[in-house]
Amino acid sequence: MSPTTPADQAKKLIKVPEMRRIKHIYFVGIGGAGMCGIAEVLKNQGYKVSGSDIKASKTTAHLEQKGIKVYIGHTADNLKAVDVLVVSTAIDPENPEVKAAIENRIPVVRRAEMLGELMRYRHGIAVAGTHGKTTTTSLLTTMLAEENMDPTYVIGGLLNRTGVNAALGASRFIVAEADESDASFLYLQPMAAIITNVDADHMDTYGGSFDKLKDTFVEFIHRLPFYGLAVVCGDDHNVREIMPRFGRPTLTYGFNEDNDIRAVDVVQEGMQSHFTVLRKDREPLRLTVNQPGLHNILNALAAIGVATDEGVSDAAIARALEGFSGVGRRFQVQGEFELGEGSVKLVDDYGHHPKEVEATIKAARQSHPDRRLVMMFQPHRFSRTRDCFDDFVEVLSQVDQLLLLEVYPAGEKPIVGADSRTLARSIRLRGDVEPILVDPVEGNLPNIIQKVLQPNDLLLTQGAGNVGAISVDLAQQQLYLK
């Protein structure tokens, strides 16, 4: 008998036993950040996987290289001997593939429900919170990997260390982001959970009620078994408010003295942050995280809390943090190009909520104190722009120069008073910065950039839409005309 490989062991270990009747899994919108990772993991487990997307992309090309058939465009003819259809909340119920599946009695499940099935028979670790999920999930995954625990992981961004956002590991561990945007994280049944923070976002899901949002986070913690573990940010007021209702073993982390896991003696130098972590019954541990910003120290503390509980050594934690190469579009340095007697440094970041944008601005100021900060910001969703309008005005006024793109709709219809022109007017009236409206479609971006940028600027492209592609083009000097 030939010896089994780690891949063979992983397939036997993680394949869901109760899904034995399922052979062919089809993903509608397979190129989405939350979909492609699950699709790839299922393919690696031995299922037949196919799917469709509205357009070709690097992600769909990657999936096809892995042997996953991807159709461009949605049509009922794509469904060939499919056993289950996986959709995200972004998919219209009138989608022809969804309608065909319903007509043919093919089960239609949400992506989080499928992720929940992957987690059901494993030691699942779910990372929830309004901000910081992707980086925290990536840090924890890296710590487990450094201890040779070989976890399966599903992340909302590309882990720079591996170049992918999901992988099938040979161990019982699975680490995944838990998405509160549509309350679908309630499908998960993890053994350990992290809550990084709780803020008002995706309020349409919760009927505009912040209390309902907080109630749902409590319900998420109740998905843990009574012997599970919740690791939550004790510095976050909203998390502290709901903690008494958890009813599960809980550890808090943060900078404040009343936390179980604390960071002290913080020193920030360039693109690195140094701190000492204090934990109960442990010696103080001096660490360096290869990321700037206090928010990334908090992300590291969350990962340390779970990693320590799972048996990861201090040495592995230290190696993981110091060697952490980041996540795609999370304060990602895209490069530099020469300008005059200096250069312009390009950084790209996915943050799209006012608190995320503010954390990125602080990290940029701390890591590059001698550079002028020029931000190219693309608001994401009209509803978020409406709900967080005043906060956006305040935060975006903190940069030295602001280039403002139109709102990326993400499938939403325009909302009166929630567009970039109105946002620019309010920022201008505040008087701290003079915003410049930019429309890349009109082809005026190169000329505007030429006029705005100065030697030794830091240009930060910010947002969850397609603004990141501009940073890539700039790094390749396709948009900057000398």
From Swiss-Prot:
- Pfam family, any one: Mur_ligase_M
Q: Which residues form a coiled coil?
A: none
Keyword annotations of the record: ATP-binding, Cell cycle, Cell division, Cell shape, Cell wall biogenesis/degradation, Cytoplasm, Ligase, Nucleotide-binding, Peptidoglycan synthesis
Q: Does the keyword Cell division apply?
A: yes
Listed under catalytic activity are: UDP-N-acetyl-alpha-D-muramate + L-alanine + ATP = UDP-N-acetyl-alpha-D-muramoyl-L-alanine + ADP + phosphate + H(+)
Q: In which pathway does it act?
A: Cell wall biogenesis; peptidoglycan biosynthesis
Alphabetical list of InterPro entries matching this protein: Mur-like_cat_sf, Mur_ligase_C, Mur_ligase_C_dom_sf, Mur_ligase_cen, Mur_ligase_N, MurCDEF_pg_biosynth, UDP-N-AcMur_Ala_ligase_MurC
A GO molecular-function term, please?
ATP binding
Q: Provide one Gene Ontology cellular component.
A: cytoplasm
Enzyme Commission (EC) number: 6.3.2.8
Which compartments does it reside in? Cytoplasm
Summarize where ATP binds, as residue positions: G129, T130, H131, G132, K133, T134, T135
Biological process terms from the Gene Ontology for this record are: cell division; cell wall organization; peptidoglycan biosynthetic process; regulation of cell shape
The entry assigns this protein to a family as follows: Belongs to the MurCDEF family.
Question: What job does this protein perform?
Answer: Cell wall formation.
Name assigned to this protein: UDP-N-acetylmuramate--L-alanine ligase
**What is the protein's species of origin?**
Acinetobacter baylyi (strain ATCC 33305 / BD413 / ADP1)
Top-down, what is the taxonomic lineage of the species of origin? Bacteria, Pseudomonadati, Pseudomonadota, Gammaproteobacteria, Moraxellales
Gene encoding this chain? murC
